[in-house]
Amino acid sequence: MCGRFAQSQTREDYLALLAEDIERDIPYDPEPIGRYNVAPGTKVLLLSERDEHLHLDPVFWGYAPGWWDKPPLINARVETAATSRMFKPLWQHGRAICFADGWFEWKKEGDKKQPFFIYRADGQPIFMAAIGSTPFERGDEAEGFLIVTAAADQGLVDIHDRRPLVLSPEAAREWMRQEISGKEASEIAASGCVPANQFSWHPVSRAVGNVKNQGAELIQPV
């Protein structure tokens, strides 16, 4: 699963790879976002399309509709999200992109778990496919968004882990288009997924395990 990631650069660093200024309805903000330890249950900047323009909204990371009596879900599997009763409406009408610098995976080493930071080897930001309950701008505290995870056995540090479905910038832009059908979105997810050999990773401090910890040192090699 994808349960922690870094979103630290400026909005422009991410947006520049996705769309021209004319396609966006997003105020310019030169300040880095500065989040090196983004955790579920917090509001995260999420990119989506409305009225043919891209919008950036702070959206709750987690999804728990009124009838759901368990902790909020944070991931949706790419193999089943498009057809499952719970996620199909979100797949069809609530596609979005969560941009990031990389994400964290933990691997058991002896009796402890070692965290690793995973990122694109070419240094580009990553664009994680997401689905959620629209309209995103309403700021719902329960029905937010989920990160779509890639097919089983595509983990990197741990082959059995499920990594986020990372799309190329071109595929990410298409994924968000409102006129794209659910079936077409499935095709984009399959053809636009960044392959495993495009990623690098290194071990990082176990301090990232505490959601209260922030700072650039959390993504530095140890």
Curated annotation (Swiss-Prot):
Changing H160A: Reduced formation of the DNA-protein cross-link. Slightly increased binding to single-stranded DNA. The record marks E105 as: Required for sensing abasic sites. Changing C2S: Abolished formation of the DNA-protein cross-link, possibly via the formation of an oxazolidine ring with DNA that is not as stable as a thiazolidine. It holds the Pfam family SRAP. Changing W67A: Abolished binding to single-stranded DNA. Changing H160Q: Strongly impaired activity. Changing W106A: Reduced binding to single-stranded DNA. The keyword DNA damage applies. GO terms for molecular function: peptidase activity; protein-DNA covalent cross-linking activity; single-stranded DNA binding. GO terms for biological process: DNA damage response; protein-DNA covalent cross-linking repair; proteolysis; SOS response. Changing K70A: Slightly reduced binding to single-stranded DNA. Formation and reversal of DNA-protein cross-link depends on DNA context. Catalyzes formation of the thiazolidine linkage in presence of abasic sites in single-stranded DNA. Mediates the reversal of the thiazolidine cross-link in presence of double stranded DNA. Keywords: Covalent protein-DNA linkage, DNA damage, DNA-binding, Hydrolase, Lyase, Protease, SOS response. The modification Thiazolidine linkage to a ring-opened DNA abasic site is found at C2. Sensor of abasic sites in single-stranded DNA (ssDNA) required to preserve genome integrity by promoting error-free repair of abasic sites. Recognizes and binds abasic sites in ssDNA at replication forks and chemically modifies the lesion by forming a covalent cross-link with DNA: forms a stable thiazolidine linkage between a ring-opened abasic site and the alpha-amino and sulfhydryl substituents of its N-terminal catalytic cysteine residue. The N-terminal catalytic Cys-2 residue forms a thiazolidine linkage to a ring-opened DNA abasic site. Glu-105 catalyzes reversal of the thiazolidine linkage; self-reversal is favoured by duplex DNA formation. Glu-105 is also involved in sensing abasic sites in single-stranded DNA (ssDNA). His-160 stabilizes the abasic sites by forming a hydrogen bond with the O4' hydroxyl group. PANTHER family: ABASIC SITE PROCESSING PROTEIN HMCES, DC12-RELATED. Belongs to the SOS response-associated peptidase family. The thiol group of the catalytic Cys-2 is deprotonated by its alpha-amino group to form a thiolate anion that is poised for catalysis. The abasic site sugar moiety is in equilibrium between its cyclic furanose and open-chain aldehyde forms. The Cys-2 thiolate anion attacks the abasic site C1' position to form a covalent bond. The Cys-2 alpha-amino group proton then transfers to the oxygen which is stabilized by the Asn-75 side chain. The O4' rotates to a new position and interacts with the His-160 side chain. This is Abasic site processing protein YedK.
